[in-house]
């Protein structure tokens, strides 16, 4: 690759994915051949940590190169403002064409009334049909908002056109078999070909094929899964036997040594208590889960990951088909992890445990990162947002680092 040609950038991103769901990070049961190949051909980060284990703060940090204390998105529900440039805006200024497909979540989803958020359900419920462009520096946007059975926006509207019964098929009452009772865990009746994961892959491929070839590109393919609900379609929902899954990490009496909000969440009386009190959501607190239910939750999570891996494989095949491999940086990561029973907790929140803080991160850059036989090359990075955005801005065709946090 010529050093004076700006490389393309393809950012493959998931939501709430544990690093131990990938073969390249030591899981010997889950099938993730496409992502594992990225690690074998590039660099696998072993100490890549999130600055905040919630979606909006973590995503704002990745896109701005700032910590939550600087960009202001300290928790979910706080919109990212325009005071700081995003990496997409910096790259546009450096001559890049930019596109985002899938989940962005830089605006709040659950505003009470329209006008606060382009991504909010309230706006889409009163007639919004597109995202105003450019959106945080992205010149093209195909957005998926929400998760699985609770989705709205462009993906949900596309699904209603091609599969009118799709929304109903995703609901737990239409599960393919009786659920185990684990939190938000069931076998989705939605056909895999119209699942959001495959829609993100299809739209990403379409964007790559129709890109502005006169400019290098920055394309984000952001899968809303494997965030809960843990409801993959066939064949992924039955791909892994819960009895083969390792139990969560728990120590007897450990909650007794932790601050009170840990036990309150465990019992369903603290963080997220409104969801646990709403019986229509079938949201069980962690204390109500059995060992087999934790394993069943993880088995479904693995199924979601393999569905994503198949989608990643399709995208990477098109990168090769279009002759883009040698001049394209491919990055795979997630916004944060998930606890899934570790330390008696599920989901993710104000608990600083490895399961939700230490995440997968893989970079493939032909000609810059050596590839060859043997195990993946490892690198260390103790916090994600600033080093990643700075390195990207330094390396990609002279995009200036102005506005990026240097701490």
For every predicted segment, state its role.
Residues 1-407:
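Formylglycine-dependent sulfatase
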């Amino acid at each position: 690759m010529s050093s004076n040609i700006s490389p393309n950038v393809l950012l493959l991103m998931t939501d709430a994915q544990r690093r131990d769901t990938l073969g390249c990070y030591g899981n010997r049961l889950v099938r993730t051949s496409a992502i594992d190949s990225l690690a074998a051909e590039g660099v696998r980060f072993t100490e890549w940590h999130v600055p905040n284990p919630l979606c909006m703060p973590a995503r704002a940090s990745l896109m701005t190169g700032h910590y939550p204390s600087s960009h202001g998105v300290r928790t979910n529900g706080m919109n990212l403002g325009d005071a700081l440039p995003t990496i997409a805006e910096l790259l546009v200024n450096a001559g890049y064409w930019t596109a985002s497909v899938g989940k962005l979540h830089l605006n709040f989803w659950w505003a009470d009334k329209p006008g606060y958020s382009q991504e909010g359900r309230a706006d889409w419920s009163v007639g919004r049909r597109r995202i105003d462009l450019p959106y945080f520096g992205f010149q093209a946007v195909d957005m998926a908002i929400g998760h699985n059975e609770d989705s709205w926006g462009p993906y949900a509207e596309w699904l209603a056109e091609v599969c009118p019964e799709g929304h109903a098929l995703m609901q737990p009452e239409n599960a393919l078999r009786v659920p185990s009772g684990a939190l938000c865990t069931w076998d989705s009746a939605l056909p895999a070909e119209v699942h959001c994961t495959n829609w993100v892959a299809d739209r990403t491929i379409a964007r790559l094929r129709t890109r502005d070839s006169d400019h290098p590109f920055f394309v984000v393919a952001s899968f809303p899964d494997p965030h809960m609900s843990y409801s993959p379609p066939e064949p992924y929902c039955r791909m892994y036997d819960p009895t083969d899954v390792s139990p969560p990490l728990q120590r007897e009496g450990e909650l007794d040594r932790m601050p009170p909000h840990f036990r309150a969440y465990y019992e369903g009386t603290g963080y997220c208590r409104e969801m646990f009190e709403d019986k229509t959501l079938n949201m069980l607190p962690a204390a109500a889960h059995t060992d087999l239910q934790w394993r069943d939750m993880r088995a479904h999570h693995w199924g979601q990951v393999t569905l994503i891996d198949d989608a990643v494989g399709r995208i990477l095949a098109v990168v090769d088909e279009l002759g883009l491999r040698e001049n394209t940086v491919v990055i795979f990561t997630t916004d944060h992890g998930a606890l899934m029973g570790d330390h008696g907790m599920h989901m993710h929140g104000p608990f600083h445990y490895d399961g939700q803080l230490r995440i997968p991160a893989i970079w493939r850059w032909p000609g810059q990162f050596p590839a060859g036989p043997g195990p993946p090359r490892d690198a260390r990075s103790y916090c994600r947002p600033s080093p990643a955005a700075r390195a990207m801005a330094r390396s990609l065709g002279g995009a200036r680092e102005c506005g990026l946090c240097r701490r």
